[in-house]
Every structure is written in C-alpha cells, then in structure tokens.
Amino acid sequence: MAELDPFGVPAGGPALGNGVAGEEDPAAAFLAQQESEIAGIENDEAFAILDGGAPGSQPHGEPPGIPDAVDGVTNGDYYQESNGPTDSYAAISQVDRLQSEPESIRKWREEQTERLEALDANSRKQEAEWKEKAIKELDEWYARQDEQLQKTKANNRVADEAFYKQPFADVIGYVTNINHPCYSLEQAAEEAFVNDIEESSPGTEWERVARLCDFNPKSSKQAKDVSRMRSVLISLKQAPLVH
C-alpha cells in the first residue's frame, strides 16, 4: 500500500493513465491557487452587495459617510444627510447652532428696533404738531377773511351814501349797476333820454323820442292799438316839424 502525504496525495505523485506516476507542475498549481483566491473575493463582494447595497465610490482622502461638498451645501448652510439616529442628532444640533445668533448680531438687531421705534414716535409727534399748526393757520385765515369782508361792506355802504347824494343818482345808479335787481329797460331809456337832452342839437328831438319807442308790432304786449301813434312818431322822425 502506497504512503499518503498530508494532502492525501500519494507520495510518489499522481499516477498517469498508463500507471506511471508523474511529477506535479508548479506553474499549474500556482495558477489554480490564484483562480481560487479570485473566486473567493468575488463571492465575498457578491454577498456584501446583497446584504448592504451597492458600494459607492468614495473620493480619495475622504472617509466613508462624509457627503460630497456640493451635495452638502444648501443656500450657503452646511447640512448632514441623516441615515440613522446619530445623523439626526447631528442635524438637530446644526439647526440649533444656526438658529442661535451671535451676540453682535443680537445687539445690532435690538439697536435697530429701538432706533425705528424712536423714528416712529418722532414722526407721530411731528404729525400732531403739523395738524395743530394747520388748524391754527386756518382759523387765522378765516378771521382775516371775515375782517376783510366786514371792511368791504362798510366801504360799500359809505360809497353808496356818497353816490346817492349826487344829482340824478337814482338814474345813474340803475344804469351803471346793470346787475342790480332793480334795473329795468325803462330806467335805462330814461337815462339815455336825459343824456340826449343834455347833448341835444336842434332838429333831433323827434329822433331821440323815436329811439325810446319800440316800433316792432310783434314785440308789443299792449292790448290797445298804438299803430297810429307809431306811424305819427315815425313820420315826425323822418320829417321833423320846423319851428
């Protein structure tokens, strides 16, 4: 019976097909060992993928679990993605740190608030002063207007008294004050007749009389027939009597 080595291979080496024991090839044994090791590594990676997911590539010099510099910045604030309780606590502490303001910023904010409140109080005070001043000036303006109106009325009364002391004041007053409620066409005609008398020339008497008459038959509102009188006045105007 042939002796066996520790690996169960006959000491004389493997027997060939013709029953002759051959020597082991070192190169073939080395290649077989390398293939076995490679197969073992591939099997380990396959089990790791099934257990924990696909392994991600990490940048050189960065340990696993640190997020990318671009993905970890939002609006200028650094945050950590949480995949577990530890990351959640870290995110909460990060938010607390962002919410807590520095002492200088807090002091500046308080000073700004006090300054704005002072400006608002000053604006309200100035507004009240301006309103009071405007009311006072308006009252003074009304007083001046009333005083000026009273003076104007007094001056008008004095002027009227002096005017009506003149000769023919009634006639002149009616004509010169056209907007006066007592003004009438008859009074204007009377004034014109008086002026014609003062500036009359011989032979124009009947012409001045004709100017005082209305020779339009349609505009006459009188019930009496004055057609004969109109014809006489027209004839005298055209051919006045010679004294």
UniProtKB/Swiss-Prot annotation:
Family (UniProt): Belongs to the clathrin light chain family.
Sequence positions bearing N6-acetyllysine: K218, K237
Residues modified to Phosphoserine: S100, S201, S231
InterPro entries assigned: Clathrin_L-chain
Compartment(s) where it occurs, according to its Swiss-Prot or TrEMBL record: Cytoplasmic vesicle membrane; Membrane, Coated pit; Cytoplasm, Cytoskeleton, Spindle
Topology versus the membrane: Peripheral membrane protein
Quaternary state and interactors: Clathrin coats are formed from molecules containing 3 heavy chains and 3 light chains. Interacts with CALY; the interaction stimulates clathrin self-assembly and clathrin-mediated endocytosis. Interacts with CKAP5 and TACC3 forming the TACC3/ch-TOG/clathrin complex located at spindle inter-microtubules bridges; the complex implicates clathrin triskelions.
Organism: Bos taurus (Bovine)
Any one Gene Ontology cellular component term annotated for this protein: clathrin coat of coated pit
Chain positions found as Blocked amino end (Met): M1
GO molecular function: clathrin heavy chain binding; structural molecule activity
Protein name (database record): Clathrin light chain A
UniProt region (Disordered), positions on chain: 1-22, 49-87
Gene Ontology biological process: cell division; clathrin coat assembly; clathrin-dependent endocytosis; intracellular protein transport
Pfam families xref list: Clathrin_lg_ch (PF01086)
Keyword Metal-binding annotated: no
Stretches the record annotates as Involved in binding clathrin heavy chain: 95-157
